[in-house]
Structures are given as structure tokens and as C-alpha cells.
Amino acid sequence: MEIVFSSSLSSTLTVTKILRSPRHATTGNMQDYSRFPLFFTIASRSNASQAKHRRSANYHPTIWDPKAIECLRTPYTYDGVHGARLQKLKDEVRSLLTTFTKEPCGQLKLIDSMQRLGVSYHFREEIEEILNLVELDSDSDLYTTALHFRLLRQHGFTISKEVFEKFRNEDGKFKDSLKEDILGLLSLYDASYLGMHGEHILEEAKDFSTEQLKSLLGRSQGDIVTYQVKQALDVPLHWRMQRIENRNYINIYQKEDTNNLALLELAKLDYNLVQSVYQIELKELARWWIALGFREKLHFSRDRLMENYLWSMGMIFEPHFSKCRIYLTKFICILSSIDDMYDIYGSLDELELFTSALKRWDPMALEELPDYMKICYLAILNFASELVYDVLKEEGLYTLPFIRDEWVKLCQAYLVEARWFNSGYTPTFDEYLENAWISVGGHEAIVHACALLGHTSTEDFQNFLKHGFELIYWSSLLVRLNDDLGTSQAEIKRGDVVKSIQCYMIEKGVSEKEAKDHVKGLISHAWKVLNEESVKCSLSRSFVNVCLNMTRTAQCIFQYGDGIGTSIGVTKDRLEFLIVKPIL
């Protein structure tokens, strides 16, 4: 079925409606097909377009050509010898969990190693049961007490901050005898980042352990513990992107004298097998990205398929969430191009039109859009239809109202920023964040991910989003703050809207350093709220982890600047060892 418009820009637009329906469906009235999603292809023959001054961000070309991605190879596969060996190793490691039943410290160390090696998802039920039952003696040392505290909070269990009181003197300060206990101090430091508001002892623990670890570093001999201390002081364990931590910790664990060879082999094999899943997903995504046509049609936007996949992998790395990662990557790829359209390329009147058209959610709205926006508009509708259809088919859950609302809210937030820029308006810090936590796309990404985590009904999904709002909000705010710290200078140079740092500088009349310190303070504040919400939250740990992991991924991507816009360097290196290079 074809619909032909006569465009106001003297172009002819052909829209072909493609029904994704069972083979036996026959042509008939459109109402007969209302239960199936509509997919659209676009062919535009434009005679001319209105000449407008267009800005450019001058993004470098992709360093990951989609055709090269399709050539990724690995000898690892779940079939045959590797799959059989994986199962055998899982059985061996599972038996280890029962070996230490009378040694709580041994159990806790094993669980911690499993988590940091990236294999704990195989033993989730066993780990939860152990953590629910394990109790420490009153004379347990600093290392074990802090490790126990951290693991319980990470898994959503309630544990009091008072467990650290025994390590303080009568004057309330941590004992001098702890100052040489480097493993205990590192464990205390890691635990302190699971603190909540009002837990002053954990703030004191953070200050004390930080000071002592820095002092010990000055006298260290460069061993493996020293390396871990440097790593912790650079990025706290609780803030690290999981998959990068897994790769790094495998290298650390194999150098430890007390490592378990079966667990080490499992970690390496599992890492390589999961990497093979990532490569399969990326090959599918590379074909989709080429077919989408953004690379040829939208020269102003970032071509960053691999880097966008890093976001998805960071949010949810386990192999059985493959479909979630694929849809998240598609979402982020389209979002990035739409973001560039609002930030850089589109004129304000065009952006007003696009936002209005998206509210209508109707392919007929294409007639009023300039040619370059048509492909963006249809990409959103096609993607949403594909996702909604898949979730409806697999889960029986109808998500279109939620998905549509997220896209509309996102573009409305983009439009607010475009209006600010075009009018020369500088918002206050609070006014900026009120809009920017939405425009960063975190809320929208989590809603898309949640649609693929499995729900029993539309009401269940709605309640999920309602009761998880605080987690979604604070994790999205953290993404925005990390983004601004890493990208604000580059975005200001290319003429983008002011970011939180500039808003605070102008509003308060302070230096850039003071503004950045304020943002860093807000990041610490937000993490404390997240810690509390992740324990209070009665929703699935998969949902909680997606929220936390999105924040961790943002910290990773923007740690050294704009890891997406300028992805040559650290981002490239990380993608190579996460996706391309197996562990030998």
C-alpha cells in the first residue's frame, strides 16, 4: 500500500506501509491490521531544500566500520567443548560455596571474587541464600567486617552502620592500630561508598581510609595490593563499570597466591563466551545500522555504533539479556542522532515542527517536515513499532503508550535546550537540571530496558516504573552530571547550550573549579540517595542493577572527557579488550 504526498518543499514522498504480520494475513481494510505494528520506508526525491545556515560539531568519522564489525571472529562458542567445560567448571565452583560453611570470611571472599570476576550471575540464588544467613563473630577483623557490610548492601540487605563502632576509640576516631592494615583499609574504603545520608561514621571511614591509603602508597613496593589501592583511589569499586572491572580483576586474581584455579578458569572461559555473544549482537546491529541510512543521510550526527553498544553492555552485561542490549543500542543510536539534530543542525522553527509532529505520532505528519527530518521521524516510529511488537508477542505486554511518551518527553526536553540556545538564555543551575536529567536520556533508556526485563501485565509494568521512579531519577541525574563534567568544554567550544558547570558559574559568580567541585559534591550526594533507594526498593534486582549500572557506565565513558564524541583513545582501547580481544 502506498501513500503519495505533494510536499510544500516541492518534493515527492513515498511512504510504504509494511505490515509485520503472519503469512496468512490478507489485504483488506486497514482496521484489520490494527493489532500489528506499522513499519515505514521512505524514498524522497527532493528538488531543492531551503538554504539555512547549519552548524557542525565536526565529529571525527567512526573508527569502527560496520563492515569490519561483521568480520569479528572468536574461537569460543557455547556449543561443543567450550559449553561442556563451562558447565563442569560451574559445578566445581558451586561446590566451593558449601565448602566454607563454617568459615564466613572464606565464603564472603569467594562471593566477592565471583562478583568481581563476572561469574556471580551463575550462582545468584546460592549467593543470596548465603548472604541471608551468614553471621560474623563479634571479634571479626576490619577487612571481614567491611567486606560483609559491602556485600550485604550491594545485594539489598539491611545492615547497620554500627558494625564499625568497634573500630573507633572513645573519642570517636578510628583506632591508630588500623593504620598499617592495608587490606582492612582498602575494604573499609570500598564499603564507605555504600553509605547513605546521615551515616556520619561512613563519611569518617572514607576520610580515614583515604588518608591512610595515600600514606601507605608513598611507602609501597609496587605489589598487586598497591595496584588495587591506586585503582580504588582513582575510581571507587562501587562506581566502576562491571565489565571493565571483570576484565581487570581477572588479571589481578590470577596473580594472587590464594586464587582458586577452577574459579579462575571459569572466569576466563565465561568472559570469552560472553564476548562471543557480544560479537553476534554487534554483527546484527551493524547490518541494522547500515540499513537505517543515518550514516549517509545525516552527516551532521555521530556515527558511533560500537560506542553506543558500550552503553548497553554497561547497563546489562549478562548473556541472557541479549535482546535488551540490542534494543538499547538501537535506541541510543537513534537518540544520539536526534540529539545532534536538536543541538547542532536543526533550526528552531524546524525543531518546533519536529516536536509537534512527534506528539501527533502519525506518519501523515511527515508532510510538514524538511527532508532530513523525515528519516529521523520514521526511524523513531519504526523502532518503537518493532520494540512494541516484540514485547507484545513475547510477554503479552502492550508498551506503546510508555515508549511513545518517553520519546515525546525526550524531544520536548531537547526543544527546551534549543530555545535557550537560540534566545541566548542561561538558566539557573536548578532550572537547567530540572530539564537536563530528562534530556540526557537516562529515564528513557531505563524504560526501554524495563520493557524487556519481563513483566506479567501492563499494570505490573506501570507500577514498576512508578515505584522505581526515585532510582530512575537519581541514576539519570548522575548520568547528566558525569556527562557535563566530561563534555562541557567541548560542547561549549562547538557552540552548544550551556551545561550545569557554566550555569552554576554564572548564577553564583564562581570559578570553573568551584563549579566543578559543586557538581562533584552533588554526585556524591546522589550516590548516597541511590544507595538508600537500592536497599529500600522492593523491585527486582535486575531493575536496580540496570539503574546503578547506567550510572557506572556514564562515569566510565566520561571519566577522561567525551568518550563518545571523541572516541579515539581510552574508549577505543576499552572496546577492544571488551569485545575484540579474548583473554588468553
Swiss-Prot record:
Mg(2+) 2 binds at residues 339, 343. Mg(2+) 3 binds at residue 491. A motif (DDXXD motif) lies at residues 339-343. Keywords: Lyase, Magnesium, Metal-binding. GO terms for biological process: diterpenoid biosynthetic process; hydrocarbon biosynthetic process. Binds 3 Mg(2+) ions per subunit. Mg(2+) 1 binds at residues 339, 343. One of its GO terms (molecular function) is magnesium ion binding. Pfam families: Terpene_synth, Terpene_synth_C. Its EC number is 4.2.3.-. CDD domains: Terpene_cyclase_plant_C1 (cd00684). Its cofactor is Mg(2+). Does not produce any detectable product when tested in vitro. Probable sesquiterpene synthase. The Asp-Asp-Xaa-Xaa-Asp/Glu (DDXXD/E) motif is important for the catalytic activity, presumably through binding to Mg(2+). Belongs to the terpene synthase family. This is Probable terpene synthase 9. It comes from Ricinus communis (Castor bean). The lineage of its organism: Eukaryota, Viridiplantae, Streptophyta, Embryophyta, Tracheophyta.
